[in-house]
Each structure stands twice: as C-alpha cells, then as structure tokens.
C-alpha cells in the first residue's frame, strides 16, 4: 500500500513539472560526464517526498558538469496558494546569493585600478572612520572603543569589517540588537540613508579580526555605486548580467516578470508560524548588494559556470582567471577568528574568499565535496556551489525562508555527490 501511495504522489508530482524551456547551457546525458541517471533520479524522489509532505511548495534544480547541463528540472508549485505549477524559468528572490554577484562587480573595478582591496572604506564614505567598536562588558553594558585600524575594502569582501546583521539566531549579542535585519534598510531608504543609518551603529569587532556575517557586501555595493557613478543594478546589468545572458536578473522585477516569482507557504511547515518573503511584494528604494536581487536558476548557473571557467562564458569575459583564483582563495588568515560555520553548521572546514565561502579541508564538513569548493546560499531558500576539482556547478531554487532551507542544502549536496560515479 505504501508503495502505491508513493507512486501516486510521484505521478502527481511529475505532472506538475513544467514543459521544457530553453536550456541555459549545452546539455549532456548524465553518463557522458560521470553521473548516474538512476542516481540523479533520487533528486526527483527527494522533492516528490518533500512536496507530498507539504514541506516545500516546489523547486528548480540545475546541475552541470564539464560545462554540460545534466539535470534541469522544475518540481511542484510556483505559488502554493494559487496552485500554479513551477516553471523552469521561475524567478527566485536570491537573498544572500546576491553577494557573490556584487563581489564580482567590485572585482571588475579592482581590475580597472579603481577599487583596490587595501583602500580605506572611509575614502569613499568618510563617516565609517568615526565608527566605534562595541565591547560587551561583564554586566552586559557596551563600552565603545576606537578602531585599532581602519576598515578596508578587503574587509567588506570577507566579512571582517565588524559590521553585522540584526535579527539572526546566530547573532544575539547586545550589538546585534542595535542592527536592522538584512533587507530593512533597502526597503526603508536609499543608499545614502543606509550609509547614514549603519555608520551610527557600533562595530561588533575590531576590523580585520573576526568573520562576522552582515552588511559588509551591502556597503561594498554602495562603494561600487560611488566609484562607478551608477546604481548597483545598472552596473551589474552592464558588466555581469547582460554579458552572461542572465536575462531575468534584476533588483526590480517588472510587471511582466512578477507572475513568475516563486512564493512560499503562508505558514512555516516546521513551526506553523506565518512566514513571507517581503521582497516579493515590496519595492526596495536601493539596490542592496547583500540581499535584494532576483534571477532564474538558469541565470545563476550561467554565473556559476563563468566562475568555474575562470571568469568567461561563451566568449564573454567578466573577470580574468587570476582574479577569479584570488576571489576563490581563502582570505581568513590565522590572525582572523573564523566563524563561517556559525552561519551554517555544515560549513566546518570552510574559510571565506572575496564574497564566497571556500572549502579548505577534507572532511570536517557535514556534506561531501573537495577543497576549493566555493559556495553561498540565500536565506529565502536558494543554494549555489561550484566544485572546481569535479568541474561541477549546482544551483537550487526553493521558496523556503524558514530553517528547512538548511536541510535542503545538505540533502541536495548529498544526492549530487552520491550520483557521481566517475
């Protein structure tokens, strides 16, 4: 009986898959690039179970090896309230998967000699020079101390500026309680208002001493705007998105794009509490480089393949191979406290490069992979990783803003490596 029930659920799940859309990369049979077709079918089974259990509305998964797409499927529903089937060209709120793209934008300016890593942040926005460091005393009070050294542009890329996010379960210090959540400043004001707001807060740590996940890449986006004299979205469109053929990437979905926005369940399947992705229905007043972009999974796998190729895709070069190599090296030296695994438990054995997490060790992590793997994810349910040793890029989109998103990241990576036979 259980087999019959599962077969029926799988059939219903398969019926919700979208008709074929244009593939974002050349395609190959799994066996041609070292995958097992039956192994990759476990991805279908996994999402069939999750959708049948109403733990996630739907997903889009893209897997490429050797530059060839071997798995590109849509599962379940785009909008669980309306019952709309999930299309391959669904548009996802990327949240922090915006950060690697903003980092690439900054590195294009570095290559032009316009934004060196060792530049002082205060050279672009002087108010950062006056920020103090909040040191928590034994009685819980904050003592404000001067910066031991200035915040550098380098600190923004690797999250060692001392800036943080509020509203995160891994950031519950007295300093964190003073900070807004990741998207609030972009909803409430423009770039200048964001800078004025953030520079009135204390830093969580002395610059260059500890990895602290937060607004660093948002500030980098503001610096990019200052240097380029363009909005971040305009600069990304001209220098990253359009050259790579990322046709739906944007900070402001158009009226034509909005019907393709992936939406979550109204209530968190784990807690039963109301949940929402505010950016789906709220126009931001600034292009926040840390959290506010949208794209399809097909768009983002082209971005990932560009990085895996050393900065080029289909004849369009975005960065030099040497710059990509520098970006994807670990920039957390022994003098810096590495708290990357605090953001996500499965990131033991990871350091951090310029806008991406970088695996530095065999073992340690809860998920398979190789040293040199680069990745980052989004709080609304998106996932991205590249494994240069395996010539592999994987991008996943779900609308799952609760804690379930972390479960999917681990399970998907387990399934992908389990399907690799060569």
What is each model feature region?
Residues 7-19:
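Bacterial N-terminal signal peptides
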Residues 26, 123-126, 131-371:
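Short, surface-exposed loop or secondary-structure junction motifs
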Residues 36, 99, 296:
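Short, conserved phosphate/pyrophosphate- and ester-handling motifs at nucleotide-, phospho-/glycolipid
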Residues 44-48, 61, 67, 92-124, ...:
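Active-site SXXK
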Residues 384-385, 391-400:
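Short, well-ordered beta-strand elements
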């Amino acid at each position: 009986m259980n087999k019959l029930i599962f077969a029926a659920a799988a059939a219903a799940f398969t019926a919700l898959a979208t008709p074929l859309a244009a593939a974002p990369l050349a395609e190959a049979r799994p066996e041609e690039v070292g995958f097992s077709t039956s192994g990759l079918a476990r991805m279908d089974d996994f999402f069939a179970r999750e959708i049948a259990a109403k733990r996630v509305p739907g997903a889009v998964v893209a897997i490429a090896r050797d530059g060839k797409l071997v798995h590109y499927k849509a599962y379940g529903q785009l909008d669980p309230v309306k019952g709309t089937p999930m299309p391959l060209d669904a548009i996802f709120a990327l949240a922090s998967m915006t950060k690697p793209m903003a980092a690439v934008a900054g590195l294009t300016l570095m290559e032009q000699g316009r934004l060196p890593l060792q530049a002082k942040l205060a050279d672009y926005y002087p108010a950062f020079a006056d920020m103090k460091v909040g040191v928590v005393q034994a009685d819980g009070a904050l003592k404000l101390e001067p910066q031991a050294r200035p915040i550098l542009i380098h600190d923004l890329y690797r999250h060692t500026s001392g800036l943080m996010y509020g509203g995160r379960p891994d950031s519950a210090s007295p300093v964190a309680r003073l900070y807004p959540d990741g998207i609030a400043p972009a909803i409430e004001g423009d770039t200048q208002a964001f800078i004025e707001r953030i520079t009135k807060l204390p830093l969580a740590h002395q610059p260059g001493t500890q990895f602290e996940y937060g607004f660093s890449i948002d500030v980098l986006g503001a610096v990019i705007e200052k240097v380029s004299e363009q909005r971040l979205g305009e600069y990304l469109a001209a220098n990253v998105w359009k050259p790579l053929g990322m046709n739906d990437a944007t900070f402001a979905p158009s009226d034509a794009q909005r019907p393709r926005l992936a939406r979550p369940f109204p209530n968190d399947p784990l807690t039963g509490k109301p949940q929402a992705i505010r950016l789906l229905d709220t126009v931001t007043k600034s292009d926040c480089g840390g959290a506010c972009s949208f794209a399809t999974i097909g768009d983002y796998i082209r971005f990932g393949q560009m990085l895996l190729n050393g900065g080029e895709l289909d004849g369009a070069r975005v960065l030099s191979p040497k710059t990509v190599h520098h970006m994807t090296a670990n920039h957390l030296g022994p003098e810096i406290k590495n708290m990357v695994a605090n953001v996500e438990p499965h990131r033991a054995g990871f350091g951090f490069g310029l806008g991406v997490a970088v695996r530095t060790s065999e073992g340690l992590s809860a998920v398979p992979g190789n040293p040199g793997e680069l990745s980052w994810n989004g709080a609304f349910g998106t996932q991205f990783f590249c494994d240069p040793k395996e010539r592999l890029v994987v991008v996943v989109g779900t609308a799952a803003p609760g804690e379930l998103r972390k479960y999917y990241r681990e399970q998907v990576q387990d399934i992908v490596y389990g399907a690799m036979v060569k």
